């Protein structure tokens, strides 16, 4: 993603090539990839969306990664999860607690329902207008 896709897009398309004009979001396993890609590459994305996914553990490594991510100037970290999502709810709440502790600008949207496209459409519709302000 960071070494191949972003450079390709920036070379072949007319885009503003900086983190303040770059967003990433993913749902379910893609949300997990979003967490990993952004926490391992601080300073690449200004806007981050994680739908129906979170983090398993908050240890020293994760804390340091999120400190670096916060220091990189993330403008928005959006987390959405269904209240009946047995797969991701605990991890989503854990992620939100970490964001709160680290002082991120974040939004958490916990909706009725589970791990469904119905909810993911809600989160995308909610997050999209917040981008690039």
Positions of predicted regions on the chain:
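Non-catalytic cap/lid and distal C-terminal segments of serine-dependent acyl enzymes
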Residues: 1-133
């Amino acid at each position: 993603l960071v070494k191949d896709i972003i450079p390709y897009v920036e070379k072949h398309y007319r885009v503003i090539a900086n983190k303040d004009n770059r967003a990433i979001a993913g749902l379910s396993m893609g949300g997990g990839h979003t967490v990993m890609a952004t926490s391992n590459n601080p300073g690449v994305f200004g806007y981050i969306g994680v739908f129906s996914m979170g983090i398993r553990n908050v240890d020293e490594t994760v804390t340091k990664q999120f400190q670096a991510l916060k220091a990189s100037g993330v403008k928005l970290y959006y987390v959405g999860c269904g209240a009946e999502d047995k797969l991701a709810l605990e991890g989503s709440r854990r992620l939100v607690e970490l964001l709160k502790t680290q002082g991120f600008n974040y939004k958490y949207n916990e909706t009725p329902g589970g791990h469904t496209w119905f909810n993911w459409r809600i989160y995308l519709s909610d997050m999209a207008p917040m981008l690039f302000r």
